[in-house]
């Protein structure tokens, strides 16, 4: 099952956009500030701009600071994981990813994101 299909099944708002590297991802976000993704799935190992550099850039922009980011990577480097969490990621999974755990993680993150973006009135 593809990531796009999983997001569709979970009713994640906005469509899935696939960028080949961090530079393309930053360009997409900058060009689409009025329709930001509900979640970003990111790899550490990407050409031109790696995932850590991408995270640093988006976390320094007020429009992108709170976007939930999940790392899906082959990197088993502990420093990558620590630095990613220090930069505010919502989840980290090493490939190959267990489908059920992935779905569960995305469900929890999207639920939390929706609650934080649209708090219930008391």
Where are these regions (language model features)?
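Acidic, metal-coordinating helix/loop segments flanking the phosphotransfer/catalytic sites
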Residues: 4-5, 18-39, 103
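His-Asp phosphorelay/catalytic-motif detector in bacterial-type signaling
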Residues: 12-13, 35-39, 63-68
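Active-site residues of response regulator receiver
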Residues: 42-43, 73
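Receiver (REC) domain active-site loop signature in two-component systems and cognate sites
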Residues: 46-49
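Conserved active-site segment of CheY-like receiver
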Residues: 71-76, 96
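Short, glycine/charged-rich "phosphate-handling" switch motifs in NTP-dependent
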Residues: 90
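C-terminal output helix
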Residues: 97-110, 116-122
């Amino acid at each position: 099952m593809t990531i796009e299909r999983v997001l569709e099944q979970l009713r994640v708002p906005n469509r899935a956009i696939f960028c080949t590297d961090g530079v393309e991802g930053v360009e997409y976000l900058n060009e689409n500030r009025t329709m930001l993704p509900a979640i970003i799935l990111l790899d550490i190992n990407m050409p031109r701009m790696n995932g850590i550099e991408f995270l640093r850039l988006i976390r320094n922009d007020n429009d992108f600071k709170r976007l939930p980011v999940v790392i899906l990577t082959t990197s088993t480097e502990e420093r990558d994981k620590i630095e990613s969490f220090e930069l505010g990621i919502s989840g980290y999974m090493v490939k190959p990813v267990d489908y059920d755990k992935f779905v569960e993680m995305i469900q929890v993150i999207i639920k939390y994101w929706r609650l934080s973006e649209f708090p219930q009135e008391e």
